Amino acid sequence: EDYERLKSHVLALCFDTGTLGTGRLWHFHPVAFITHFRRCCWLSKSELKQIVPRNLLRMAGQNDYRWEAIIYRDGVGSLADNIRTHINRAMQKHLITTPLRLACFLGNGIQETGWLGTMEEGYRYTERDPRTHQIVRRYNIWYYPWYGRGLLQLTSPLNYFEYFSFRGRVYPVNIKDTLINEYNRLYSHRGIRYTDNHLSDTENHIPENIISWRDNVSSDNHEATSSAGFYWASRNMAYYADNEHILERCSVNTRRNGVKIYYRSQAFWQASAAVNLPAQIDNEQYQGLNGFNERCCAYGSAIAVLT
C-alpha cells in the first residue's frame, strides 16, 4: 500500500513533455528549471565578460568622440576573475536581482573601475613644462587620501564615514567632522586646494583602524563590492533602476571611425546620477556626469545580454 502511494506521488510529479522526443520523462522540465535559476542573476565568468563592451565611446572634448577598444583581462588571478564572486554576493545581498537593476549597477561599476581593471581612482598626477615637456613635479589629487575606491568609487570623507557607519563601525566623531569641514572648504575654494590643504592623515591624527578601513575599500574585494552595495542602498538606486527603461538610440560621428551607435535611457541616467550627481537626477539633457557615454556602452551591453 505504501509503495502504491509512493508510485502515485512520483507519477503525479512526472510528465512526458512530448516536445523533446525519445520518450524521456522529466521530474522538472529542463526549460522551466533553467528559467527559474536564471532569476538568481548569478553571473558566470563568461556572462560577465559579455557585459563588458568591446569598445567604448569616449568624449575627448566638445563634439570630439573617440571609438576606442577596451582591454579586458579576466585570466586566472586577475582582478576581474577574483572579484566576480564578490560582485555576485553583493548583488544578491542588496537585491540587485533583475536584469534592469544589474544593468544600472554594472553599467556604472564596470566603467568606474576601468573595465574591472582597478578598484581605485587614478589620484597621482604629473605636471610637465609646456616648452620642454620635462616633468616638473608629481602630485596627488587635492582630496587625497580620500580619493575614489571600490566598485562604485567611494569618494570624500563624508561618503567614507557614512560607509563606516553603514558597516556598524565606531569612530571619533570629531575626526569625521574635521575632515568633512576641510573637504567642503577646499571644494568651495578651488584656488587653495593645493596651497592650503589639511586633509592628510598625519595632520589629522587619523587612527590606524580608520586608515585600514579606508584603504581596504580598494585592496579587499569584499569591501570594494560592499561599498558599492552601500551606495546602491543609501542612494536609492533601485527606485530609479525599476522605472521604465525607454531606450534612446544615439548616433554620433567619431574621429576616424565614422558613425557609431549607443543607447541610453532616463532611468539609467537617474540611477547613475543618484550616486555621482544627485542635483542633476532630473536633468533630461544627460549633461554633467563624467563618462556617461562610456557608462552607456556597458549599460547597453548588459541590456543586450541580460534581457
Across the structure, where does each feature detected by a protein language model lie?
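Cell-wall glycan-active module
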Residues: 1-136, 169-171, 175-176, 192, ...
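A structural motif
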Residues: 144-210
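Glycine-centered flexibility motif
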Residues: 148-150, 215, 235-236, 291
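Active-site rim elements
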Residues: 211-219
